[in-house]
Amino acid sequence: MGVGQSHEDAGYTSPDLTPNLFPSSKNKSDADAEQLSLKLAERFATKCFTPLELTHFKDNFYQRATEQGGLKYWNEKTLSDFLSIPDHSDSHCPLDAGPVIFRMASYLGAFPFQNSLAPSVLTLEALIKVVVLLTERYGKVLRRGQKNRIRLLFGSLADVARKEIEKPAENEGKEEDIPAPSQTRGFDIDAPANDNYDEDDEDDLALAALESLDAIEVFKHDSRIDKRVYEARISLSTFRRLLMLLLVIAPLKPLEDISNYTVDLNETRMLSVREEADSILAAFEQEASGGISYKTFADTITSSFPYLFDPLTPLFEHLLFSKNLDFSQHRGSDTTEAEQMSQPVKSSLASITLPGSFESTILSPSIISHLSFFLPSTSDNQNLLHGNVRLHPVFSIAAHGSSLTSFSHNVLTWQSGTLFLLYGQDTDTGDMLTLGAYLPQPWKSPTTSQSTSDFSSSVLPCLFLLSPYHILLRGNPSPSVVDKPNTPTAYFSTHHGIAIGCRIPPSSRTQKLPPTPLGAGSLVIGTSLESAELHISPFGHDGVFLPPGAQPTKSKSETNIDIYNLEVWGLVPGSNPNGSSSLQKSAVELQQASWDFEAREAERRRHVNLSAGAGDSALEQARWLLETAGVIGDSSGTGRCSRQYGVVTMCYQ
């Protein structure tokens, strides 16, 4: 039974256990775009979904489809209701993302013939293509992906203004020789602007590739754009509504109930979401004529928001699981699998932050979602939220005070990666700033030669600004920088405070020079933990951080900051969403063991007995211990203890 033959399913009650969604059709040399589009949908269905997923998909579609003229399809309200996406009909929620998602689906449903078929009616075949493209399951059919997917997403969001093109003089008065346009107008972004463009020579190759379903060129077909005559833009209003939806559903896991994230959007929550959306939006430079161009969109997404569209995957995967199906009466062996697939997960909405010594005054659900758009998990193929990384509270000025001793005690004893966050005020403009650094490796002191990490070597550190606008400086993978001992990612000293992304000058007995900014970005925090300097440059590849791929023109090269709060969160990788993995225990236990050792040593020093009642041997032993610990004696003693870098170092002369 064919997808386009929905009228044959008027008596549809339940799907077949072995679905055959598409009819076997004869190959025709004059196959039109709709037939080729159907063939691509068939290949997507058979190669990208399991038979059980197809069965669930078909059940979801036909149970909710609207029928008109023998054609079954989904309208905007049906799609929004199924995905639990708020739209303009929800007066208590100004999110209004339903029309944007429907617009995207109507465009992607016409793939790869957006020029002639878009906007498409959301039939089953169209929805199959939408789900495959938005969940990135097309890898088994299409050999190209990420860059062209960004182009597709841009086309699905863009408002296009096409320049008027004067026809050559010889064409005047020959309108009768021009074929009438198709009744399906499509999206202007995909209309060919120059019929003599060189890429026309590839049309037959693209059609042959699509017809044979070896679709290397499928993204190119019907998408020829002459950049000299097109002005394609995404309006800020459209993109803002999509960003707000992505911020709300960013924590969404597969099969999680979407309404957990969309039903309780009060005014305070929506204000926070709007602020983060505006910070992200500010990273996309607007054209003079208004809106966001394709080049800006593609460059900014690639360099600054590699995981921005990740929430769309679990969102649209809900189409692959139906609540109505019960296979227990048909397949006893598959009962467990079917029941699990047909029952959405009731999320407990567990926070990414673990309980500890303080609660964050910087992190909020919206900021965490913002972080997940560019921060990886233990490997760079998953974002911070989808990789099940948890955040363990390590240090906070609000909880532990602005003391370097306290910072050293809490941070340098944490043997895992950290998320460094700072909230303060720009002393020049008065703007409130939120910035930070992602440090997948443990903090190092000058006496530390090696450290281990549970993060992949492909996960690099980064320096970022979250508000009032987004800037991301990725870590430099060059061995010439990584292997240099004088360019640590993060550096701590009681003489100069905290330095991230700086060059550390060699020290001497007479003077100790402060760290100096290096490369494209650095952060320097004074010993009082009350002020900081942020340096960002559009050039410089010799430092820890590379220049930002997208930098707003209003950004400054140097920003002086009054610190309101500073927080350090330990990165706890693990597969257990409750954060009870052995890795988490290892990180916490290592820190606790270090603290216990320090406490025992302090207790020993406190109970050293120098009274006359002790024998000479005991007296000498006690004196040696105190001199070694730096409690008594001077620089000419047999030993001394230094906590300059937050660790105990024995020095013998």
UniProtKB/Swiss-Prot annotation:
The gene is rtc5. It is found in: Cytoplasm. Residues 361-572 form the TLDc domain. The keyword Cytoplasm applies. Residues 1-28, 165-194 are annotated as: Disordered. It comes from Emericella nidulans (strain FGSC A4 / ATCC 38163 / CBS 112.46 / NRRL 194 / M139) (Aspergillus nidulans). Residues 1-10 have a biased composition (Basic and acidic residues). May be involved in a process influencing telomere capping. This is Restriction of telomere capping protein 5.
